[in-house]
Amino acid sequence: MPEPGFAQALYYQVSGSADAGQQAVAWALGAGADLRQLALVFDWCQDILTEAQSKALAAKLARGIQQSRRDSSLPMMRSRLLAAVALSGHLPDDPEREIDQVVRKWWEGQIVPALNSGREAVAREDAYALMEILHVVRDNFNQDLREGSPQFFTDLPMVDLLSCYPATFPAGENDYRIPAALHVGDQPDLRRAALSRAGELSMVAYDSNAPGSQILQGWLMNDHFLLRGTFGAPYEFLWANPYQPGLSYFQAPLVVHDSLLGRLFVRSDWDESAAWLGYFSGELQMFHDGAVTTLDPRSAAEQVDLKRAVIVFGARTRKFKVAAAGKEPVFVVGLKPRHDYLIEMDDEEMSEARSDPGGILDLDVPHDREAGVRLQPTGEPAKATARLEQP
């Protein structure tokens, strides 16, 4: 079993099985070293711990917090927070200091300012750890950490949904939707794919009434993707709510431009054979005919029309023509991040706009004819904290 402490402690909480609870405790007091799972066992199995076992496990959690203090990754900050919350009331002072360190100094002092200034401080693969932080803080302290960066969390469900490659991966236990990743290998990381789904399920559980959550719920409730493997099944059981109504993801937009962090995701339709483009973390990827191709937006010279959006590679293109059918948005990628540009459309009066933190510019072009566009960079790059100027 990949995560025996988590799985057995969860089973004990739900079923009351003393055998499962004792197995979780034995793992935690023995070879168990994963701080997150240790915290869950200590919290969920507290009523079957002897006094000696409780003290021993509390000491192990306290050591884990101290020994991991140099690791400031989001998953480890999550684990230390869970451990500190579990220890609260069992040890004096230290748990409260750790909670303050994670919530006030790290989240509010570092992560929120980074997100609001356009830095990608939360990686896609850390979405589940992020949601565990949100849940434990709200459940224990009645505080919603989303309030510090509302745009990031409003965009998160749709960014998460559109940043999956169109083709799914059939595994022995279930099918997987594969989240986009930098430096794609030959085989998908199915553990990462399972945690991606767990993160989506926990997003819905956190705020089931949010518009993005309702679409995400419709995306999740497909039996082919239920996590049935030994790693994923406990997460599915913990978070999935098949009785929660959702909206069909066919109603969701096929284009999402995250102007806060400078990311862009487009797919041509909802079929598994769809064409897909993703621009994130400075990398441009195309998915077509089941394969991912990485492109250099600074050297690519052609436009890409995915039926839902037109993408222009603008690093070397300062003058171009573009024809957008219907109401397709037009994006220029590969520009200088946070830089002011003069935009001249069909030799008419110029307007001014600013590229986002990823170097993406959303162009407002006429949709009834081919338009000639000229881009001219102007001025110095804007500061990271500057807001996007409207033309």
Describe each model-derived feature in a short phrase:
Residues 1-158:
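Aromatic-lined, polymer-binding surfaces characteristic
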Residues 55, 60, 78, 105, ...:
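Context-gated lysine
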Residues 129-349, 353-367, 371-372:
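Extended polysaccharide-engagement surfaces of secreted carbohydrate-active enzymes
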Residues 368-389:
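Surface-exposed interaction regions enriched in Ser/Thr/Asp/Glu
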